């Protein structure tokens, strides 16, 4: 459950992320592909170089979807229902990958934070990203 403090932390941090969604998304995806090379199999048709148009576009899509979740913190499942159906029914992405991407997003946030990421803020973001991953995984049942 996201508390009001969690929601405030998430909105504050996400304001920085959403200022440059393409670049942030590219960095998070690049981290994902480097740390977890098996995730590249879902993007075999992409040019996986960080500067490629495909990675830039997909990185922006990822951030835009998370922005939609941030804008609907009280009903993330409804906000991400279509995206969850797409990944479960059409793309058939292994659900473990949502947690891996969430971790890479959190690392990217920490890397761009001015100074150390405070523990309470990091915890709020982790709770949010976990809730997003659980929302997406729920459509696999």
Swiss-Prot record:
Gene3D superfamilies: Globins
Domain Globin: 1-141
The keyword Nucleotidyltransferase belongs to this UniProt entry's keyword annotation: no
Tissue: Red blood cells.
Transmembrane segments: none
Known role: Involved in oxygen transport from the lung to the various peripheral tissues.
Protein name as annotated: Hemoglobin subunit alpha-1
Annotated source species: Iguana iguana (Common iguana)
Binding-site list for heme b: 87
Keywords: Heme, Iron, Metal-binding, Oxygen transport, Transport
Family: Belongs to the globin family.
Assembly information from the UniProt record: Heterotetramer of two alpha chains and two beta chains.
Entries under PROSITE patterns matching the protein: GLOBIN
GO molecular function: haptoglobin binding; heme binding; iron ion binding; organic acid binding; oxygen binding; oxygen carrier activity; peroxidase activity
GO biological process, one term: hydrogen peroxide catabolic process
An example Gene Ontology CC term for this record: hemoglobin complex
């Amino acid at each position: 459950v996201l508390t009001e403090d969690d929601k405030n932390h998430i909105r504050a941090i996400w304001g920085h992320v959403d200022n440059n969604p393409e670049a942030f998304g590219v960095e998070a995806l690049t981290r994902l592909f480097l740390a977890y090379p098996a995730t590249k199999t879902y993007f075999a048709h992409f040019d996986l170089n960080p500067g490629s148009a495909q990675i830039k576009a997909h990185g922006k899509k990822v951030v835009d979807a998370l922005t939609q979740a941030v804008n609907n913190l009280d009903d993330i499942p409804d906000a991400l229902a279509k995206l969850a159906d797409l990944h479960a029914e059409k793309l058939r992405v292994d659900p473990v990958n949502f947690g891996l991407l969430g971790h890479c997003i959190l690392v990217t946030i920490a890397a761009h934070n001015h100074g150390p990421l405070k523990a309470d803020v990091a915890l709020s973001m982790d709770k949010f990203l976990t809730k997003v991953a659980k929302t997406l995984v729920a459509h696999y049942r």
